[in-house]
Design a protein with these regions (language model features):
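Short loop/turn motifs that connect adjacent beta-strands in outer-membrane beta-barrel proteins
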Residues: 19-28, 64-71, 124-132
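Transmembrane beta-strands of outer-membrane beta-barrel pores
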Residues: 34-40, 77-85, 121-123, 138-146, ...
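Sec-dependent N-terminal signal peptides
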Residues: 4-14
Length: 217
C-alpha cells in the first residue's frame, strides 16, 4: 500500500510540475530559414541569374510580456550564408567592373552573424502547437566574409568584396504552423565603396531576402 501511495505521489508531483512549466511556456526559439536574395536599387543592366539562395540558422530568446504569453519580445543570434548569382563582376580591387557573358558564372558568396530583435504575436496556448504567428522587427548583420567567384571553362578565380561590416534591416515573419513566410528589407547598402573604390554606380545596391522560415522548437 505504501508503494502505491508513493507512486501516486510521484505522478501528482510530475503533473504539478508539468502544469507549472506549461504556465511559463516559450515558443519558437530555434529557427531555420531558406530563401532567395533580391538585388534592389540597381542599374537596369545588372541582372540576377541561376538560382541564388540564402540559408540561416539561429536561436531567439522568447520573452513573453503578458499573462497569456502570446505577446513577446525576442532577441536572438544566428548565422546566415548567401550565394548571389549575378552578371556584375568587379575587377581591379573593385575599382572597375564588367557585365559578364552568359557562358560565365559569377557569384557573390558571403556569411554573416545576424542579431534579430522582434515583437511577437501568436495565437498559441500551452497545449496548442498549431497557431498563427506574426513576428516583426529589426535584424542587425555583422559580415564575416564576402567573396566573388568567377568561373568559365578555363578559369576559376576568387576575389574579396568590400562590403559594409555592419548593416540593419527590417524583418517580418508571418504564417501558421510549419509554413511561415519571411521577408527582410535592407536599410543599409551592401557595398562599402568609400574605402575601396571611386566607383559609385552601385553604392546604393541593397539585398533583400524572401523565403520560408521554420521554427524547430
Amino acid at each position: 500500500m505504501q508503494k502505491q501511495y508513493f507512486i501516486l505521489l510521484l505522478i501528482a508531483s510530475f503533473a504539478l510540475a508539468q502544469t507549472s512549466a506549461d504556465q511559463f511556456y516559450r515558443e519558437d526559439q530555434i529557427y531555420s530559414s531558406v530563401g532567395y536574395p533580391l538585388l534592389i536599387d540597381v542599374p537596369e543592366a545588372l541582372a540576377q541569374n541561376k538560382l541564388s539562395h540564402t540559408f540561416s540558422l539561429g536561436f531567439v530568446r522568447d520573452m513573453p510580456i503578458n499573462v497569456a504569453r502570446n505577446l513577446a519580445f525576442g532577441l536572438g543570434l544566428g548565422l546566415n550564408y548567401n550565394v548571389v548569382y549575378t552578371n556584375l563582376q568587379f575587377t581591379d580591387h573593385m575599382e572597375a567592373y564588367t557585365f559578364v557573358s552568359s557562358d560565365m558564372t559569377n557569384q557573390w558568396n558571403y556569411m554573416e552573424v545576424e542579431i534579430p530583435f522582434e515583437f511577437r504575436w501568436r495565437s498559441s496556448a500551452p497545449s496548442n502547437y498549431q497557431f498563427w504567428r506574426v513576428y516583426g522587427g529589426l535584424v542587425g548583420y555583422y559580415n564575416l566574409f564576402a567573396k566573388q567567384r568567377t568561373r568559365t571553362a578555363l578559369i576559376d578565380s576568387i576575389a574579396s568584396l568590400s562590403v559594409q561590416k555592419f548593416r540593419l534591416a527590417l524583418r517580418l515573419n508571418i504564417g501558421n504552423n510549419t509554413w511561415n513566410l519571411t521577408y527582410t528589407h535592407p536599410i543599409d547598402s551592401f557595398f562599402d565603396f568609400d574605402k575601396s573604390t571611386h566607383n559609385k554606380l552601385f553604392s546604393q545596391l541593397k539585398i533583400a531576402k524572401l523565403g520560408l522560415v521554420f521554427y524547430i522548437f
